[in-house]
């Protein structure tokens, strides 16, 4: 029975791994997804010896530690998914900051499009707030992310003079720091309360980073596609742990 469950999980993870591999570059999330897939198939092929090892001696402790690790990982992923709701934007903020993501050629990617659509919906309800699109030119990209973002919003009907462009940043921290600079250069000085737009899975870490740049952030969480959700959450947890215990800035 358990072996059949593992086999079903292995097949599902394989389909997810292949699907995401066809639409994304190699990332930590994708690598972890393939690692889990391979591990599940190994578990199916060598089920009997593995089960025997885990049923006695040190194997019992390895099994307990493994189960605990899985529970903690799943719990943390659930926390990351819910965290954006704790500090959700209300419309009382002073500006909207849309953080960049990868491009597909000259066009915004699916992930970035979802952020821009979330920003657009929020901006339509709060027409007095300036919009900062922030993102430089990543490796292998044909243009800056912010230029593609601005173009997308203009096509959706946002006035060009409402959109401020920040095209030098290469990290989340720089997104927030340079966005503040662009706001100040355009007459929006001493902006501290911002509504930032990110996909739900990384709103928590982005909020921590924003606070350390002197901002009072509130999240406008964007959705994410079903195929991208699992690898993105798998990648985000190590990033959060790295930020908690190593970088802290």
Regions found by a protein language model. Name each.
Residues 17-25, 78-85, 247:
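Transmembrane helix-loop junctions and nearby membrane-interface residues
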Residues 36-68:
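Cytosolic-side transmembrane helix boundary signature
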């Amino acid at each position: 029975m358990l072996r059949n469950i593992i086999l079903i999980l292995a097949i599902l993870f394989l389909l997810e791994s292949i699907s995401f591999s066809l639409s994304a570059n190699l990332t930590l999330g994708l690598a972890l997804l393939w690692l889990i897939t391979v591990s599940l198939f190994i578990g199916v092929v060598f089920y009997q010896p593995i089960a025997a090892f885990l049923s006695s001696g040190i194997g019992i402790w390895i099994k307990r530690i493994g189960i605990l690790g899985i529970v903690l990982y799943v719990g943390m992923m659930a926390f990351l998914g819910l965290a954006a709701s704790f500090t959700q934007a209300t419309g009382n903020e002073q500006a909207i900051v849309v953080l960049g993501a990868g491009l597909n050629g000259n066009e915004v990617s699916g992930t970035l499009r979802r952020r821009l659509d979330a920003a657009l919906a929020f901006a339509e309800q709060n027409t007095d707030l300036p919009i900062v699109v922030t993102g430089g030119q990543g490796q292998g990209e044909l243009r800056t992310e912010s230029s593609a973002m601005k173009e997308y919003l203009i096509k959706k009907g946002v006035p060009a003079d409402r959109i401020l462009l920040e095209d030098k940043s290469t990290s989340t921290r720089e997104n927030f720091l340079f966005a503040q600079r662009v706001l100040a250069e355009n007459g929006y000085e001493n902006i501290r309360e911002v509504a930032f737009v990110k996909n739900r899975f990384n709103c928590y870490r982005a909020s921590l980073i924003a606070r350390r740049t002197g901002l009072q952030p509130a999240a406008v969480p964007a959705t994410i596609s079903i195929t991208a959700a699992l690898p993105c959450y798998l990648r985000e947890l190590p990033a959060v742990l790295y930020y908690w215990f190593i970088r802290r800035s």
